[in-house]
């Protein structure tokens, strides 16, 4: 969903950048329509969980979870704000087809009872990745002692702004 918001920002000064951002994300779309929350263009193993942990993706290695479906709203805002030429309309039509495929995936796999409510399977899918809202439900997850992985997120950003190790253990 980050790419959607980045594209929306780009659209204020460069429509090509905005459409390129969305198309880069959509290159990682799975055959069944799912859009993963991370695409691993760089197969760096210093990030955890990395591409080898997820072991997912078609042409581009990816995570196995998604994030909130904001692309349709983003596209609407981009179209409302910009004058679109014929070449851009062709690109946008291609994007719209892929977004529709994603929405069909959400209905099929995340709302099989057609309740209108899409399910999430992991806190990272919510858009509220490290929110305290998850503290109570995650306490119910029993974790193994001494999980073998190295975090990189708390090395790049001050660890006081990142989840505690016990919370991260529950995420993974």
Tell where the protein language model's regions lie, with residue ranges.
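Short glycine/proline-rich turn/loop motifs
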Residues: 2, 51-55, 164-172
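Extended ligand-binding clefts on enzyme/binding-domain cores
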Residues: 93, 103-172
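Helix-terminus loop motifs that line ligand-binding clefts
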Residues: 15-96, 107-110, 114-124
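Conserved H-X4-D acyltransferase segment
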Residues: 1-13
């Amino acid at each position: 969903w980050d790419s959607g918001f980045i594209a929306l920002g780009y659209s204020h000064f460069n429509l090509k950048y905005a459409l390129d951002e969305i198309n880069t994300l959509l290159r990682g779309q799975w055959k069944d329509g799912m859009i993963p929350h991370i695409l691993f263009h760089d197969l760096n193993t210093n990030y955890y969980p990395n591409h080898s942990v997820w072991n997912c993706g078609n042409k581009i290695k990816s995570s196995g979870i998604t994030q909130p479906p904001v692309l349709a709203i983003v596209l609407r805002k981009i179209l409302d704000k910009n004058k679109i030429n014929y070449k851009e309309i062709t690109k946008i039509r291609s994007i719209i087809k892929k977004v529709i495929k994603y929405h069909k995936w959400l209905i099929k796999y995340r709302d099989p009872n057609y309740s209108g409510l899409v399910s999430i399977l992991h806190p990272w899918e919510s858009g509220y990745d490290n929110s305290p809202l998850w503290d109570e439900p995650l306490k119910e997850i029993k974790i193994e002692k001494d999980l073998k992985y190295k975090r990189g997120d708390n090395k790049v950003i001050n660890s006081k702004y990142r989840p505690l190790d016990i919370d991260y253990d529950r995420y993974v």
